[in-house]
């Protein structure tokens, strides 16, 4: 398969986007992925201090990535429609970031090995014994959560972790209809649809945003 890697956007590319947006809008809310996972936030903060961007580009560090960041963007659009000021939106987003987390069940240890998070020996053993790690991302910090034998067990464990999280920290939001679940997958269309249905069965009536 393809050798996949990531890198932050170049400062030039970021400024080109900002310049174009500022031709039409008075202010920009710029939402890079979590500062705990990428230097994109720090780079953007540095650029935003330049005179032409000062006070017009507001960089948001909501501690999120992937589907939760998508939800943050949808929430931002809703707040803009309601007439919220940009500074107030940034404040609310950064507070909300503390109330979101991601559980990630990994099919392979290969990318953790490439990123230096596990040794080649550990990755090889994980492959032999079909070990699937689960990671937890909260407030921009990525930590190991649990190791499971097989992907089905990993998915079940991730769902159980969310049940515990909701019961202990988000029961009021669930009761008020203010809870949102977010699902992502890198499988086939059929596998992705089955994954979402599996989540719906456990959390009936809870809105699910799927990426």
Q: Which stretches of residues belong to each language-model region?
A:
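Mixed-charge interfacial surface used for oligomerization/domain docking
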Residues: 27, 36-40, 44-50, 54-58, ...
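N-terminal glycine-rich anion-binding loop in soluble enzyme alpha/beta folds
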Residues: 1-13
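N-terminal glycine-rich phosphate/adenylate-binding segment common to multiple enzyme folds
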Residues: 13-41
């Amino acid at each position: 398969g393809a050798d996949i890697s990531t890198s932050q956007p170049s400062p030039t590319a970021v400024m080109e986007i900002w310049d174009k947006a500022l031709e039409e809008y008075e202010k920009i809310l710029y939402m890079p992925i979590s500062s705990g996972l990428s230097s994109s936030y720090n780079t953007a903060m540095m650029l935003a201090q330049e005179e032409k961007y000062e006070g017009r580009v507001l960089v948001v560090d909501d501690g999120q990535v992937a589907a939760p960041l998508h939800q943050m963007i949808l929430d931002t659009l809703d707040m803009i429609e309601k007439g919220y000021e940009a500074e107030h939106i940034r404040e609310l987003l950064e507070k909300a970031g503390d109330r979101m987390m991601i559980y990630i069940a990994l099919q392979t240890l290969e990318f953790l090995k490439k990123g230096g998070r596990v040794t080649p020996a550990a990755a090889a053993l994980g492959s032999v014994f079909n070990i699937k790690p689960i990671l937890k991302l909260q407030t921009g910090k990525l930590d190991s959560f649990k190791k499971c034998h097989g992907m089905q067990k990993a998915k079940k464990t991730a769902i159980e972790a969310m049940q515990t999280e909701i019961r202990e920290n988000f029961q009021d939001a669930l009761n008020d209809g203010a809870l949102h679940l977010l699902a992502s997958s890198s499988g086939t269309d059929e596998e992705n649809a089955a994954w979402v249905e599996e989540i719906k069965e456990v959390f009936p009536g809870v809105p699910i945003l799927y990426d």
